[in-house]
Amino acid sequence: MILYFFNTLILNFLSKIIMAYKPNMEDIKNLRTMTGAGLADVKKALTESEGDFNKAMEIIREKGQAIAAKRSDRETSNGCVLVKAVEGFAAIVALKCETDFVANGADYIKLTQDILDAAVAAKAKSLDEVKELTIADGTKVQDAVVARSGITGEKMELDGYNFIEGDNVEVYDHMGKHTLCTMVQTNKAAQEQGHAIAMQVAAMKPVALNQESVPQSVIDEEIRVAVEKTKQEQVQKAVEAALKKAGINPAHVDSEDHMESNMGKGWITAEQVAQAKEIIATVSAEKAANLPEAMIQNIAKGRLNKFFKESCLLNQEFIQDSKLSVADYLKAADKDLTVVDFKRFTLAAE
């Protein structure tokens, strides 16, 4: 009786092994095409689901979620940035990951392109809206990103999205490296000039279109910094002049560390250090209390104008001809031609 029982168990076990689903090459190929998952993951998912493609896809998706959760604190400093324009709409999408090896992979670039295509087709107005879109294979964008994270084992995040609505938009992928993209919209059709300005935006990093579009809070902060810097420079000049008059090299006493180091080298005496400290304290206080306000404001205004020239697109020197501003370059092509909007996204820390 006992022998019969064990024989039955063994036979049942063997029959399950014999009858167990074994994924064939066609199923493996189809699921890999659908998910982009690795060979081992596809085989395992098909086996566990006994050939049920929907269950297998869910297994792969859950694995991606688990990996993404484990790596949520990782830094994503690499990725893929792509840009696209169609009639009436243009957008930039940035999908970030941990390493350039993954970022440069064909599957990763394709996923970024699929997301961009969906965003442009839907004329999406926000990153949250993009995440809820469906890409060409029927997968929701956020699910596709999580799945790719599971496949590569890296944290991934859809981190950047910009758009311009309207016509006359030229786009630029800097050096075709998919790390910096720009869009420029002109007030009338001007493909050559638009492309040139898109390159300008990539190289010169403007923060505003023109002086009028700079927020007042930014202007106020620039003035504050310019005034403070000007005051510090005026005080420093007075201190250096007083030190030189006393026969002390300002470079030898510009910090406590230098004072100690230079005394050890015999370049300056303890008495000179004491004298220098007294000069620095006295002259700094006197000069700071008697700075001419009109002069300070004039110098600060000059620095603000320099900020506008460097940071406002239309005020910038044109990179292809430094004798012209961007506005002048556009007017040379057409007296009414100008830029009405621009966007820029880069993976680089700037």
Residue ranges and their predicted role:
Residues 1-18:
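Short, Lys/Arg-enriched N-terminal segments with co-localized hydrophobic residues
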Residues 20-350:
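N-terminal assembly/interaction segments in proteins that build large macromolecular machines
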